[in-house]
Amino acid sequence: MCLLGVSAPTVASYDASAPMSTASNGDVDIAYRVVGDPQAEPILIIMGLSASHRVWNPQLITGLAEGGYRVVLLDNRDVGESSKIEKKGRLWLAWQLLKYRIGLRVKSPYALSDMAVDAVAVLDALEIERAHVIGASMGGMIGQIVAYDFPQRTQSLVSIMSTTWAPHLPQPGRAQQDGISEMNESSEEQAADLQKLGFYPSALPNQVTAILSAGDRTARVAQISAPTLVLHGADDQLLSVEHGEHTAQTIKDAQFKVYENMGHNLPDPIIPQMVNDMLAHLRANPI
């Protein structure tokens, strides 16, 4: 595969079914796998709400690995093969969402900052001092926290379809909120089918409230010093393009790119260009 006009050696294809390794953050075990040359510069890549690492587009993972990088994928706590935390019920999430809408404090079993420490624990397990960090949606929020809480571990940042959660930004549409509620109300059979696709409805109460309880992180995001690339879809109905624009405006010297025909997802047609954009950013900021 040749990207950006630079040839790279062929690496093993991304196999999401291969056995995973485990890192520990206290009592929490975080499952991870590595794709690509073990001697190459590392990329830590973090997926979003209720989704395991298997949700990443294989073409994107393989493209980054064949571009000359060691790609480290993890399952956030509560999804995939990582530890499952105290399970909260559907009614509990509905109550927390109602409190958020009327301006009351939202409670969560853990914080996004805890999930950032989980990610750093994976770097520790692999004895990686510095890494490029890529995150999508909630994973982008976690990546931002890694960048501002652990600047010494962050070589560069790519924040995809994510947000600072500033209060002036458009809230998710009713259809998108209803979609999250419907997933939260999945039957056991529906949940099993979703898990086959890499989604874990059981994680929603804990992770949604982790996002909401974090609130506006604009002041902290402004502290990010790592070179940053912000990517967003023009058609994103969950986190509108204004969220990506504000993230890029908040981080000094951040680059911002919008993809047409991309919503809150990673559609196949845009992956080759996205990989090229990521590789250009990574190569401009080597470890």
Where are the language model's segments positioned?
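Conserved HGGG/HGGXW glycine-rich cap/lid loop of the alpha/beta-hydrolase fold
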Residues: 28-98
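Conserved acidic catalytic loop of the alpha/beta-hydrolase fold
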Residues: 101, 109, 113-131
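Conserved alpha/beta-hydrolase "nucleophile elbow" surrounding the catalytic nucleophile
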Residues: 131, 135-137, 233
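Flexible "cap/lid" loop of the alpha/beta hydrolase fold
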Residues: 141-148, 157-184
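Active-site nucleophile elbow and catalytic-triad environment of alpha/beta-hydrolase enzymes
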Residues: 204-220
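Short beta-strand/loop motif that positions the catalytic acidic residue
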Residues: 224, 230-232
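Conserved alpha/beta-hydrolase "acid-adjacent" motif
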Residues: 237-243
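Catalytic active-site module of serine/aspartate enzymes centered on a nucleophile-bearing elbow/loop
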Residues: 254-287
